């Protein structure tokens, strides 16, 4: 069936991010707030696996912004990213990385502000749903304005 996602689950699309990059992006989505542009740029420049290794203190981070590294280390990952991916797959969700075939090309209009990755639920390919979809999203640290609008 064309336009439907297969049982890729935690692996995302058939072609795309390797396992290390996928796990690192999953881990980073747990500890970083949406819109952390410096993180997205660092992951694109250095690789998400290198950024995640630096956050865990397993590798040096000479090319990683010190303020970003400090911010990420304030939010330790309590669960391994493998568990998050397994739980998502159990709910019929999948984890889409920018390297995946399914990644919506339309996100390029965000000019460096695109998300690190996307958690998606449903069978329709994200790349095909993107042009006719609406999303309501939020962050853990909502502003007063955001809270007011969401409650209306």
Task: Tell me what each language-model feature is.
Residues 1-151:
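Short, positively charged patches
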């Amino acid at each position: 069936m064309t336009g439907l996602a297969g049982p890729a689950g935690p692996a995302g699309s058939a072609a795309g991010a390797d396992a290390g990059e996928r796990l690192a992006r999953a881990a980073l989505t747990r500890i970083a707030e949406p819109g952390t542009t410096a993180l997205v740029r660092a992951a694109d420049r250095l690789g998400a696996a290198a950024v995640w290794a630096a956050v865990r203190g397993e590798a040096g981070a000479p090319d990683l912004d010190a303020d970003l590294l400090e911010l990420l280390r304030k939010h330790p990952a309590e669960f391994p990213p493998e568990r998050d991916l397994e739980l998502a797959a159990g709910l019929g969700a999948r984890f889409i990385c920018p390297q995946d075939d399914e990644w919506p090309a339309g996100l390029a209009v965000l000019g460096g502000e695109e998300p690190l990755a996307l958690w998606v639920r449903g069978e329709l390919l994200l790349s095909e749903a993107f042009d006719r979809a609406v999303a309501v999203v939020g962050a853990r640290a909502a502003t007063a304005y955001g809270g007011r609008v969401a409650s209306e």
